[in-house]
């Protein structure tokens, strides 16, 4: 299990591509930046943004 991490900018987008794969994701900067850049988030948080 990967520990929660701060993911910002390109790192955040790369992580979403890895987690969501072919499903793709919806990028809502305000929500996900608040959740994953300002605070650490985990893989389950990222999965909430997959399509």
Curated annotation (Swiss-Prot):
GO cellular component: extracellular space
CDD domains: IlGF_insulin_like (cd04367)
Species the sequence originates in: Platichthys flesus (European flounder)
InterPro entries, per database record: Insulin, Insulin-like, Insulin-like_sf, Insulin_CS, Insulin_family
Name of the gene this protein is made from: ins
Functional description taken from the UniProt entry: Insulin decreases blood glucose concentration. It increases cell permeability to monosaccharides, amino acids and fatty acids. It accelerates glycolysis, the pentose phosphate cycle, and glycogen synthesis in liver.
Family: Belongs to the insulin family.
Recorded GO MF terms: hormone activity
Classification via Pfam families: Insulin
Protein name, entry field: Insulin
Transmembrane stretches, start-end: none
Quaternary state and interactors: Heterodimer of a B chain and an A chain linked by two disulfide bonds.
Compartments (UniProt record): Secreted
S-S bonds: 8-37, 20-50, 36-41
Family annotation (PANTHER family): INSULIN, INSULIN/INSULIN GROWTH FACTOR
Protein keywords: Carbohydrate metabolism, Disulfide bond, Glucose metabolism, Hormone, Secreted
Major site of localization recorded for this protein: secreted
Gene Ontology biological-process annotations: glucose metabolic process
């Amino acid at each position: 299990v990967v520990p929660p991490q701060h993911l910002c900018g390109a790192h955040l987008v790369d992580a979403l591509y890895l987690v969501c794969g072919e499903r793709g994701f919806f990028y809502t900067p305000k929500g996900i930046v608040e959740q994953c850049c300002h605070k650490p988030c985990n893989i389950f948080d990222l999965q909430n943004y997959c399509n």
